[in-house]
């Protein structure tokens, strides 16, 4: 979804930075990817799988897999924190 927008090295670095359980911070992740605020908006439209205009908990849980199919799912705690702070 982000081919040509993000460098593979940036994606790998961002994923490595949150590989450990309960280490995900969405601001740090987007910064590591080099996403601009406009690109972040586009990204959220992509992970809104049901096109409801909202990011549901289950969609957010699989957030990292949008960047790499082998990435881990977010924990319940990480998902809840991201929903509250986003």
Swiss-Prot record:
The keyword Magnesium belongs to this UniProt entry's keyword annotation: no
GO cellular component, one term: cytoplasm
Modified residues (N-acetylalanine): 1
Positions annotated to bind Ca(2+): 48, 50, 52, 54, 56, 59
Domain EF-hand: 35-70
InterPro entries: EF-hand-dom_pair, EF_Hand_1_Ca_BS, EF_hand_dom, Parvalbumin
Family statement drawn from the similarity comment of this UniProt entry: Belongs to the parvalbumin family.
Other comment: Is regarded as an important allergen. On the 2D-gel the determined pI of this protein is: 4.09, its MW is: 11.35 kDa.
Name of the protein this chain belongs to: Parvalbumin beta 3
């Amino acid at each position: 979804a982000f081919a040509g927008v993000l460098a593979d090295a940036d994606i790998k670095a961002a994923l490595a930075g949150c590989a450990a359980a309960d280490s995900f911070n969405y601001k740090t992740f987007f910064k590591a990817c080099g996403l601009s605020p406009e690109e972040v908006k586009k990204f959220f439209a992509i992970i809104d799988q049901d096109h409801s205009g909202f990011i549901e908990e289950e969609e957010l849980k699989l957030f990292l897999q949008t960047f790499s199919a082998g990435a881990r799912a977010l924990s319940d705690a990480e998902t809840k924190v991201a929903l509250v702070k986003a």
